[in-house]
Regions:
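Generic detector of short alpha-helix boundary/capping microenvironments
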Residues: 22, 55-56, 70, 103, ...
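Amphipathic, well-ordered alpha-helical segments in soluble domains
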Residues: 78, 85, 134, 196-199
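Helix-termination/interfacial motifs at the ends of transmembrane alpha-helices
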Residues: 16-17, 34-57, 63, 171-249
């Protein structure tokens, strides 16, 4: 007799944009944009006296170009943060679903209060996204527990477990690529410090040359140090704002999930008192 095969566990249904899973592609592209911006925009001959990038800068763009080879690295980090932020905005919007999450939460709680599980499921199907997926898993467990031959406490625990499992499946979609933004918060500052040190080394080398200071070399070194400091701090600033914004959005979504999950479990407990 042939052995019966167990059906495969259902995969999480993909709904909307799930995020870029190969972030290295974004990083490479961002650094390519940063390098091109440095070479062809900041390094445009029109930004320098006599059209010579080695000469004196005529404007701020030329001054930033004089920051040296650390500048395109910082620009690459900045472009990475911007690209990752756009990716997270799209992904987290998809996780939120089609409608307002707060209104969706209120409608689900009202449907549960009325004992209308079918309406709650219909609301989830219309909403879509991670929050709706978690609520659907809770409601499915709710229905299954109605005919399960186990004690009430075990049924409530099963509904809570279903909620935790589905939440664990959805969280990676929401938090994906956030560690990269968090890393750039530190990398931006450290790269700026590195560029600053290189600029100061160049300045002191100019001071030490022949016992006197070459004013051109000295100003170049100081300019390099300050440009790297400013651009690195700006990159870290953008990264901090982006990271905190997205973590706050995710916290609100997980709070909505937990609020509805708690309501479903306790609604079941209230409507199915143990004999």
């Amino acid at each position: 007799m042939a052995a019966t095969q167990k059906p495969a566990a259902p995969k999480k249904k993909s709904q909307g944009f799930q995020g870029v899973r190969h972030a290295i592609i974004i990083i490479i592209f961002a650094f390519a944009v940063g390098i091109c911006f440095y070479l062809f925009f900041l390094g445009n001959p029109a930004n320098f006296a006599n059209g010579d990038p080695e000469g004196h800068p005529l404007n701020m763009l030329g001054t930033v170009y004089k920051g040296g080879w650390v500048v395109p690295i910082i620009l690459g980090l900045l472009c990475t943060v911007i690209a990752m932020s756009v990716e997270r905005i799209i992904a987290i919007s998809a996780c939120s679903g089609k409608g307002n999450v707060t209104k969706f939460t209120e409608n689900i709680k009202k449907a549960l209060k009325d004992g209308d599980i079918a309406k709650a499921e219909d609301l989830c199907n219309k909403q879509g996204g991670s929050v709706a997926n978690v609520v659907l898993a809770d409601l499915k467990s709710y229905r299954e527990m109605e005919s399960a031959p186990i004690k009430l406490k075990e049924k409530v625990a099963a509904i809570q477990n279903a909620h935790e499992e589905e939440t664990a499946l959805e969280m990676p979609t929401m938090t994906m690529n956030l560690p990269i933004i968090a890393t750039i918060v530190t990398l931006g500052t450290l790269t700026a410090l590195f560029g600053t040190v290189l600029g100061m080394i160049r300045s002191f080398a100019a001071l030490a040359a022949g016992g006197g200071a070459d004013s051109m070399a000295l100003s170049t070194g100081i300019s390099e140090a300050l440009v790297n400091t400013a651009s690195g701090i700006a990159t870290s600033w953008v990264s901090v704002v982006a990271y905190n914004y997205f973590t706050n959005k995710i916290d609100k979504l997980t709070f909505a999930m937990d609020e509805i999950g708690y309501t479903i479990a306790h609604t079941y407990e209230d409507k199915h008192p143990e004999a």
